Amino acid sequence: FRTEGAEKLQKAFEIAKRIPIITSAKTLELAKVTQFKTMEFARYIEELARSVPLPPLILNCRAFVEEMFEAVQVDDPDEMGERIKERPALNAQDGIFVINPEMGRSNSPGGDSDDGSLSEQGQEIAVQVSVHPQSETKSIDTDSQDSSHFSPPDDTGSTESNSNYKDGSFESCQL
């Protein structure tokens, strides 16, 4: 802690000591005072947290994890494992495919860049995938080639031309 942080922490604890404890016999006015003092304590703790220097990488990681949990709508990461166990088996006809957790991890050099991730338990993320059969993609490619017609370029003998005409098709080349 820096000296400034220690001073703020001391001030926060001094305020916390002055917060009265409410029992059933206390009045509404005392409850309001307690609420005010609690909010004041929370403000000092928040200031303290901001005054402690954290490396930018830690802040970025925390923000990334929070965004990821929001996107996946995970309230508590510890409950994630329990939900996976309780879920009934799903089949491919429902359009949902489940990857076996025993499946090996990627062997690519960039796939698992941090060795710490090997010991962590995986989490499930919903991904929507569309499958296009090979025959559809071929017909799309041939349709687009048939519909575009190129006329052969004028043969002026220029050496600066950046295009070639071969076998009835027009190619563009980078110089």
Swiss-Prot record:
It is a single-pass type I membrane protein. GO terms for cellular component: plasma membrane. Residues 85-175 are annotated as: Disordered. Glycosylated. Residues 145-175 have a biased composition (Polar residues). Keywords: Cell membrane, Glycoprotein, Immunoglobulin domain, Membrane. It is found in: Cell membrane. Residues 1-175 are cytoplasmic. The keyword GTP-binding does not apply. Component of the elastin-associated microfibrils. This is Microfibril-associated glycoprotein 3. It comes from Bos taurus (Bovine). The gene is MFAP3.
